[in-house]
């Protein structure tokens, strides 16, 4: 097994890989987001940022987190100034997710840091980090797979599946995502 894959050891594929105290903290997080944030209007963004910071999210400047965004494990999320996590976007942060300055994750996009080791009979959980570069744009319903780095100023088209890194200034789309152009910046 590749040590870079960061497997979380499970005794059984039918049990959580997380210790009981992490499960309690995750339950508190889900309850808090539902009660204190999910219903809030757009201008309550500073309140949502505060709640995320209380649960360990690393947020700098003024990122925007939509009230209907889903964040699995907030202490694995880093967002920089002007980064945006859109409506119903899903940061499935079993591993680290880093969204740099000015990057946009559009509605219903899915950043997935977790998968399973299909060569292991117990299907061990494997996590790999995701990084979205400065001023990158992830289109609606796009899926970014574990371990992917989206380069600065890159664009991922709507409903694309991205299984590998996207270099700076590239435009990709499709399943699997393929280069369809270059993005120029002024």
Question: Where do the protein language model's features map onto the residues?
Answer:
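Terminal amphipathic alpha-helical/low-complexity segments used for targeting or macromolecular assembly
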Residues: 1-61, 135, 153, 175-186
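A short, terminal or domain-edge coil/loop segment
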Residues: 16-21, 116-127, 154, 169
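Flexible, glycine/small-residue-enriched loop-and-beta-strand segment within the central core
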Residues: 39-42, 48-49, 68-80, 84-149, ...
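Glycine-rich phosphate-binding "P-loop"
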Residues: 64
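Residues that flank catalytic or metal-binding motifs in active/ligand-binding sites
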Residues: 107, 158, 168
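Beta-rich strand-turn-strand
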Residues: 140-164
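Acidic, glycine-centered active-site loop in nucleotide-sugar glycosyltransferases
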Residues: 168, 173-176
């Amino acid at each position: 097994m590749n040590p870079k894959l960061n497997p979380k050891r499970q005794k059984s594929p039918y049990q959580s890989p997380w210790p009981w105290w992490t499960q309690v903290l995750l339950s508190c997080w889900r309850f808090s987001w539902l009660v204190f944030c999910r219903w809030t209007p757009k201008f309550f963004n500073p309140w949502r940022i505060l709640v995320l910071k209380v649960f360990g999210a690393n947020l700098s400047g003024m990122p925007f987190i939509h009230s209907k965004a889903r964040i699995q494990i907030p202490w694995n999320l880093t967002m920089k100034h002007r980064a945006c996590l859109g409506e119903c976007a899903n940061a499935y942060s079993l591993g680290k997710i880093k969204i740099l300055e000015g990057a946009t994750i559009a509605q219903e996009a899915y950043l997935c840091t977790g998968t399973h080791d299909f060569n292991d009979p117990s299907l061990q959980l494997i996590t790999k980090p995701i990084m979205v570069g400065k001023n990158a744009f992830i289109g609606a319903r796009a899926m970014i797979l574990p371990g992917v780095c989206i380069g600065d100023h890159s664009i991922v088209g709507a409903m694309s599946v991205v299984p590998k890194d996207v270099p700076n200034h590239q435009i990709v789309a499709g399943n699997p995502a393929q280069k369809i152009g270059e993005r120029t910046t002024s």
